């Protein structure tokens, strides 16, 4: 994890939620004069500091942090939006002679940073709104069947219950008349493509990780997660927006609506987060590409000098 010749260099820290990524990033930033850059698709949102485990003000005061809480919850912040924002931040950090430390659990963000992103035309808001209205009340499996009739190749790549991605594919079809796969051969290069990067993936003991996830959710409830979700609920945003689907949000909204008890909402949030952590590890194992070092969090902290 050296910093000699920092221009173009970066440290990337990934791993499942609650694995200690932020603590490692902060330790490295303090030791090496680095800038912590967010790579978590939920921590970009201003509405959810507690429930997304964003660094708190005391932590942010110890080192520069970028792209945390910078997006309003009403925005559907895509990978393309992230790539544009993070590219600008990386250039600023390098220009100042700093070391970017990119940390988070969103695999697609890291993949885009390193490999680039397909050039998909923007979908007009009128098209998106009309399609979402048409899809409201329909089962995701039925929407997937519609997609399969019009774009068999694209549908085969998506799960029959992955509503957001199925809708995205249908939107592109509606807006362009061409399947999503037609655009996936043309790629915008990633800002870290070919750059010298130290890539670390934290892998805690599974039983310990499950216990940490459950304990952290309880701590979030004590720290104001329910109030945070109540404020978000009061905004009456589209329930399909990413911020409304953050782990813990649907269950806590159901509690506020009287559909779940507090205990049921907490159990749902814990279970959803545990399942997400498992998916994160699986995704990185099969999709992240070469060059990642898999380390126990304790070993990574020792290496960082923390």
From Swiss-Prot:
| HAMAP family (UniProt xref) | IPP_trans (MF_00185)
Read off the PANTHER family from this record: TRNA DIMETHYLALLYLTRANSFERASE (PTHR11088:SF60)
Ranges for region Interaction with substrate tRNA: 40-43
Give the residues annotated as coiled coil.
Answer: none
Could you describe the subunit structure of this protein?
Monomer.
Gene3D superfamilies attached to this UniProt entry: 1.10.20.140, P-loop containing nucleotide triphosphate hydrolases
- Chain positions of site Interaction with substrate tRNA: 106, 128
What's the protein here called?
Answer: tRNA dimethylallyltransferase
Q: What is its EC number?
A: 2.5.1.75
SUPFAM superfamilies xref list: P-loop containing nucleoside triphosphate hydrolases
The catalysed reaction is: adenosine(37) in tRNA + dimethylallyl diphosphate = N(6)-dimethylallyladenosine(37) in tRNA + diphosphate
């Amino acid at each position: 994890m050296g910093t000699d010749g920092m221009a173009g260099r970066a440290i990337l820290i990934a791993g499942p939620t609650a694995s200690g990524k932020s603590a490692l990033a902060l330790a490295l930033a303090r030791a090496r004069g680095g800038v912590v850059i967010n790579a978590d698709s939920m921590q970009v949102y201003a509405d959810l500091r507690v429930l997304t485990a964003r660094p708190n003000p005391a932590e942010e005061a110890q080192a520069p942090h970028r792209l945390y809480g910078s997006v309003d919850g009403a925005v559907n912040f895509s990978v393309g939006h992230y790539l544009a924002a993070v590219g600008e931040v990386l250039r600023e950090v390098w220009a100042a002679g700093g070391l970017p430390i990119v940390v988070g659990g969103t695999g697609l963000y890291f993949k885009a940073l390193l490999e680039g992103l397909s050039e998909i035309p923007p979908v007009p808001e009128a098209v998106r709104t009309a399609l979402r209205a048409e899809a409201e009340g329909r089962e995701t499996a039925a929407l997937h069947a519609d997609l399969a009739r019009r774009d068999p190749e694209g549908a085969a790549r998506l799960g029959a219950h992955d509503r957001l991605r199925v809708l995205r594919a249908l939107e592109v079809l509606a807006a362009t008349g061409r399947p999503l796969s037609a655009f996936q051969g043309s790629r915008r290069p990633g800002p870290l493509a070919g750059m010298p990067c130290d890539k670390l993936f934290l892998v805690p003991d599974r039983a310990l990780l499950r216990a940490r996830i459950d304990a952290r959710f309880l701590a979030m409830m004590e720290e104001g997660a329910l109030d945070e979700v109540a404020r978000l609920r009061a905004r009456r945003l589209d329930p399909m927006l990413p911020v409304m689907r953050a782990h813990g949000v649907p269950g806590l909204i159901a509690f506020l609506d009287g559909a779940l008890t507090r205990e049921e909402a907490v159990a749902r949030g814990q279970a959803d987060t545990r399942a997400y952590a498992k998916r994160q590890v699986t995704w990185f194992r099969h999709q992240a590409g070469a060059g990642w070092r898999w380390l126990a969090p304790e070993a990574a902290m020792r290496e960082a000098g923390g």
